[in-house]
């Protein structure tokens, strides 16, 4: 669902409230539930889309990232303590209990199980984040066993249907209560909910169907990313079981600070120092930018702390056009350890400006010029 609008999937406008999202999900989940639409592949796909949309829009951090970056490149959002594996019903288990007799959590175990998502933190230099870069990363993930093709059974052997649950993965228990007879379902202990018995497990994966593998993956990082951005790589997570879809790999960006530049959003800031005389008279300075040095004319009378803007010299906007700006803060250095000639020049300057001297300054000047004679 890489290019679909999650809000549109739920029939909502962007910016919908949490309550509106929950209500829309509940209504559509009931309408398109596979048990209510047996054999309808279109309804099954719609149900998957609804689940995916709700999984993002119901999580504040994921929703924030999706609203900011869209589904094309950065619709992944943050990571909760439980990771991304599986679909969290978020209090809607009763919807599925309507069709499964209260066994929604166990019912899925004998069918395809989607792979878990993986989180990977990638640290970039300041320059790599500004210009974009291709990185090779190494991830350890669960993959389908090549020896048994993910079946879990040793080649040449096969699984058999569990005789206890007849392949359903569940057992039904009838209980008598003061209120009448109730039927509940639970996971079959004999097959652990898979519905099948493996008589001779695969010698490579020990009947699991998946094995751990270390893979190298090339990641193209677009220009303009910043710390906290999350980039999803669809289908690069852990492999599923029994034909389930693979999870996704989420790249969390961390950018190392620059020794010279400070970044705020798409704008860059840098300090430059000039003398008191140059600040008063004006001067041309050389300013370092991420693209190289540029000349800038500082007007006369510039005060310390003044900001000047270099338009379009900032960071590229991710998934958009244009760049931010660079701001140059001028720091006027006050000289220390003046020699006699420099002090005389400053006293002369004070007199030319008509500044009044206090008693101590006047006495100091008198002694200074007296020593000169």
From Swiss-Prot:
Annotated GO CC locations: cytoplasm
One Pfam family matching this protein: DnaJ
Zinc finger (CR-type) stretch: 132-214
J domain sequence ranges: 5-70
Keywords: Chaperone, Cytoplasm, DNA replication, Metal-binding, Repeat, Stress response, Zinc, Zinc-finger
GO MF annotations, alphabetized: ATP binding; heat shock protein binding; unfolded protein binding; zinc ion binding
Cofactor mode of binding and number, as noted: Binds 2 Zn(2+) ions per monomer.
Gene3D superfamilies in alphabetical order: DnaJ domain, Heat shock protein DnaJ, cysteine-rich domain, Urease metallochaperone UreE, N-terminal domain
Sequence positions that bind Zn(2+) 1: 145, 148, 202, 205
Family annotation (InterPro entries): DnaJ, DnaJ_C, DnaJ_domain, DnaJ_domain_CS, HSP40/DnaJ_pept-bd, HSP_DnaJ_Cys-rich_dom, HSP_DnaJ_Cys-rich_dom_sf, J_dom_sf
Ranges of the CXXCXGXG motif repeats in the UniProt entry: 145-152, 162-169, 188-195, 202-209
Cofactor(s) this protein requires: Zn(2+)
One BP term from GO: protein refolding
Coiled coil: none
Chain sites annotated for binding Zn(2+) 2: 162, 165, 188, 191
Subcellular location: Cytoplasm
Function in brief: Participates actively in the response to hyperosmotic and heat shock by preventing the aggregation of stress-denatured proteins and by disaggregating proteins, also in an autonomous, DnaK-independent fashion. Unfolded proteins bind initially to DnaJ; upon interaction with the DnaJ-bound protein, DnaK hydrolyzes its bound ATP, resulting in the formation of a stable complex. GrpE releases ADP from DnaK; ATP binding to DnaK triggers the release of the substrate protein, thus completing the reaction cycle.
Record note on quaternary structure: Homodimer.
Similarity-based family: Belongs to the DnaJ family.
Domains: entry comment: The J domain is necessary and sufficient to stimulate DnaK ATPase activity. Zinc center 1 plays an important role in the autonomous, DnaK-independent chaperone activity of DnaJ. Zinc center 2 is essential for interaction with DnaK and for DnaJ activity.
NCBIfam families per record: DnaJ_bact, PRK10767.1, PRK14297.1
Protein name: Chaperone protein DnaJ
Organism: Clostridium botulinum (strain Alaska E43 / Type E3)
Lineage: Bacteria, Bacillati, Bacillota, Clostridia, Eubacteriales
